[in-house]
From Swiss-Prot:
This is Ent-kaurene synthase-like 3. It is an enzyme of class 4 (lyase). Expressed in roots and stems. Signal peptide: none annotated.
């Protein structure tokens, strides 16, 4: 496990402290600074000098490091957490073996070894008793009662008996993986079958060193030599896995944008290893799955075919992680399976199927303790796919639940001001006077603040929310609030635009709705035209006209009882889902210049089509009953009609989920593809809105419900991060991602 120090962020000193935090983190990430592994260092220290009859150390610098780094509590636990872990016991016992001294810490904390409620490194019940036996054989005085010693040694006996009795395909792999604890009972020639091209065993320093303790091997010796030349007096484990874990932690807490250059270095290095099929990446299932997911989500071209060696559940069970049904590995595999970008990525589908099934079995069987963090991680992953939640909810959950760090995006400080501007806009435009209109400013601001959260994106958030509120009013006007004459009058007024005074206003309702559109488009047009360096107001008007005309088509279908073909319906309905006025203007406010050629590019239109289709179909699946009662058709009812009644409503809903899945995958693929016409930050906005649609419609009609998403509103908008204890302490906070 490694630590990454983050300084506290105090609200009233936010700018100075943010700068300090950023500098420190950049230094650490740039140098890939991680704490040494006392456990691995101890095993390397035990490697004898080849040909030495007096058991002189081959790597005396590691012995010196152990001598210099015993902590004040007697351990070699560099993490310095409030509570002692099994990992600390294991590391300390290994250092005891290397130095033949320092057993007081083990004696004081021996009960931890027997506590089944505590998390333990893989193979702890074999390696810890095995090393304790070695300590006793050396004649060192162990400050532990004989009964307790026997209880711990019995752990290994029971574990070995169970392992041999069950005899799964991964048994040999697992037994090789816990070689440090087996000593002379191990078949070291059998272990050498797992040696990799670089000379290591499982890319593990401790296992490789354990081999050299019992048998000399030139390749293994060369591997350790190379690492000692690189690191100096101590060694570190699984470099790529740790760096990816660090990167993942930064992204999950929403602060990765501060370290773009450093993160790119890690990603480029990992991608190079991926292309070379480096064993450190490809042969460790956890690292392989994590690397695939992170590389793909950062736009690197990685094929799911490269996961063919772990496509089947039998491949998993043949590994040491699979032999133990390791939850962390299963979770990484499941998360990797979710980043599919095409309908034909069957390997990801298979991985997702069996890893999800095994995770559900672990939850239901009680194999995971309900109070453990991994239980909640698994439950959350199965319950809430990454494409169905808002980024800010993920960030807050990781920061608060795992007590990882004290950090708060300063976008949150802008929330009261931004909400006030939106509420003022609603009142200034008299939208609150329209009795037929749903008031959804909180939900639209939630969708904006939950996805477009960087401080400099304030205008994008505000106009995303304003246009969302306005499209809802217009949608309700066309659905229930306006007569045909009023709707035709509204469209005519928008078509005339600056010459609208030549057209008579049919009603006060038309007046309110039209001038809300007119004033907002002109105000936004002036702002984005200044940002873009060209007049884009005409484009904003076109966006609204496309929406209004499509909505009118639906009205005419309803009035005439016309049943459109599925193709006619989808072409029109994707537009009437009304994401155009929300997303497309916001593209102008997220940074890049967008020339007219990009707006007319086929990729731009395809991004919009996929996003809108996905949102519309998700909405259709959840709102069928309400819309049917209003005399409106949607994709669900059309499928039933087209089948002549042979398809039930539930069957139709399940069938509609297939094109939803396909559109989502294609959209993600298009967003992640490099070298395209539409700038990356703009493409990301289409994906963010797709996630918003899933968030509101993956389980019922969360948008129409006044309470379904109230907890999310509270979490993102109303409730600050729970940092009181952290800020009060003013102590450094440590991040410790799972190993």
């Amino acid at each position: 496990m490694f630590q990454l120090e983050l300084v506290n962020v105090v609200m009233h000193q936010r700018k100075a402290i943010e700068d300090t935090m950023r500098k420190k983190k950049k230094q650490q990430l740039h140098k890939f600074e991680m704490l040494p592994s006392p456990y691995d260092t101890a095993w390397v220290a035990m490697v004898p000098l080849p040909g030495s009859s007096s058991q002189l150390p081959c790597f005396p610098q590691c012995v010196e490091w152990i001598l210099q780094n015993q902590q004040s509590n007697g351990s070699w636990d560099l993490n310095q957490l409030d509570s002692i872990t099994k990992d600390a016991l294991l590391s300390t016992l290994a250092c005891v073996l290397a130095l033949r001294r320092g057993l007081l810490f083990i004696g004081r904390n021996f009960s931890i070894a027997m506590d089944e409620q505590l998390a333990a490194p893989i193979g702890f019940n074999i390696t810890f008793p095995g090393m304790l036996s070695s300590v006793i054989e050396m004649g060192l005085e162990v400050p532990i009662g004989q009964t307790d010693v026997e209880r711990v040694l019995h752990l290994q006996e029971t574990e070995l008996k169970r392992e041999y009795e069950e005899n799964y395909r991964g048994r040999n792999t697992y037994m090789a993986y816990v070689s440090e604890g087996l000593g002379n009972a191990q078949d070291w020639n059998e272990v050498m079958n797992f040696q990799r091209k670089n000379g290591s065993l499982f890319n593990s320093l401790s296992i490789t060193a354990a081999v050299l303790v019992h048998n000399y091997d030139a390749k293994a010796h060369r591997y350790l030599n190379l690492l000692l030349n690189k690191f100096g007096t101590a060694v570190y484990t699984k470099n790529i896995h740790r760096q990816l874990s660090m990167l993942d932690a930064l992204e999950n807490m929403g602060i990765s944008r501060h370290f773009d250059g450093e993160i790119k270095s890690i990603l480029d290095m990992t991608y190079s290893c991926w292309l070379q099929r480096d064993e450190e990446v490809m042969l460790d299932i956890t690292t392989c799955a994590m690397a695939f997911r992170i590389l793909r989500m950062n736009g690197y071209d990685v094929s799911s075919d490269d996961l063919c060696h772990i496509a089947e559940v039998s491949d998993f069970h043949s590994s040491h992680q699979g032999y133990l049904s390791d939850t962390r590995t299963l979770l990484e595999l499941y998360k990797a399976s979710e980043v599919s970008v095409a309908d034909n990525e069957f390997i990801l589908d298979r991985i997702g199927s069996w890893s999800g099934r095994l995770l559900k079995e672990q939850l239901s069987s009680g194999a995971l303790q309900r109070t453990s963090s991994i239980f909640e991680e698994v439950e959350h992953a199965l319950d809430c796919p990454f494409y169905a939640t808002l980024d800010r909810l993920v960030h807050k959950r990781n920061i608060e639940h795992f007590a990882a760090m004290s950090y708060i995006s300063y976008a949150q400080n802008n929330i009261p001001d931004e909400l006030e501007r939106i509420d003022s806009w609603v009142k200034e435009n008299r939208l609150h006077e329209l009795k037929f209109a749903r008031q959804k400013s909180a939900y639209f601001y939630l969708s904006a603040a939950g996805t477009v959260f960087d401080p400099e994106m304030s205008d994008a958030r505000i106009w995303w929310a304003i246009n969302g509120v306005l499209t809802t009013v217009v949608d309700d006007f066309f659905d229930v609030g306006g007569s045909r004459e009023e709707l035709e009058n509204l469209i005519s007024l928008v078509e005339m635009w600056d010459e609208h005074h030549k057209e008579e206003l049919y009603s006060e309702q038309v007046e309110i709705v039209f001038f809300a559109i007119f004033n907002s488009v002109n105000q936004l047009g002036a702002k984005v035209s200044a940002v873009q360096g060209r007049d884009v107001t005409k484009h904003l008007i076109e966006i609204w006209l496309d929406l209004l005309r499509s909505m009118m088509t639906e009205v005419e279908w309803r009035i005439s009882n016309y049943v459109p073909t599925p193709e006619e319906y989808m072409e029109n309905a994707a537009m009437t889902f009304a994401l155009g006025p929300i997303v497309l203007p916001a593209l102008y406010l997220v940074g890049p210049k967008i020339p007219e050629s990009v707006v007319r590019d086929s990729e731009y239109n395809e991004l919009f089509r996929l996003m809108s289709t996905c949102g519309r179909l998700l909405n259709d699946v959840q709102t069928y009953e309400r819309e049917d009662g209003e005399g409106k058709v949607n994709s669900v009812s059309l499928l039933v009609i087209q089948s002549g009644g042979s398809v039930s409503i539930e069957e139709a809903r399940r069938e509609i989920m297939k094109p939803i899945e396909r559109c989502r995958r294609e959209l993600l693929g298009l967003v992640l593809r490099r070298g395209s016409a539409v700038p990356g930050p703009c493409k990301e906005l289409f994906w963010k809105m797709c996630k918003v649609c899933y968030f509101f419609y993956s389980r019922g009609d969360g948008f129409s419900s006044p309470t379904a998403k109230s907890a999310a509103v509270d979490a993102v908008i109303r409730d600050p991060l729970d940092l009181a204890a952290v800020v009060a302490s003013q102590e450094p906070i440590y991040i410790i991602p799972a190993s």
